[in-house]
């Protein structure tokens, strides 16, 4: 079975990682090295941004 393609673009994920302060970890060790809490915060922020765009 193939992996599901992600919804967030790589660019958006990188921007969110920079904003949330764990981009250095992503660069050094890859996405698999981030903490679950950081991943959750990234998704939460992405949802907030999407909701803001829908209001406009």
Curated annotation (Swiss-Prot):
In its UniProt record, a GO molecular function of this protein is: double-stranded DNA binding
Keywords per UniProt: DNA-binding, Sporulation
GO terms (BP aspect): DNA topological change; sporulation resulting in formation of a cellular spore
- Protein's UniProt keywords contain S-adenosyl-L-methionine: no
Which InterPro entries does this one have?
Answer: SASP_alpha/beta-type, SASP_alpha/beta-type_CS, SASP_sf_alpha/beta
Q: Name one Pfam family in it.
A: SASP
Q: Where is this site: Cleavage?
A: 15-16
- Report the function annotation for this chain: May play some important role in either sporulation or the dormant spore.
Protein family per UniProt:
Belongs to the alpha/beta-type SASP family.
Protein's UniProt name: Protein SspF
Q: Which gene encodes it?
A: sspF
């Amino acid at each position: 079975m193939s992996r599901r393609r992600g919804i967030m673009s790589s660019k958006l994920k990188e921007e969110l990682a920079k904003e949330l302060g764990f981009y250095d970890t992503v660069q050094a060790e890859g996405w698999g090295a981030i903490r679950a809490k950081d991943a959750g915060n990234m998704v939460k922020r992405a949802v907030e941004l999407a909701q803001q765009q829908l209001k406009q």
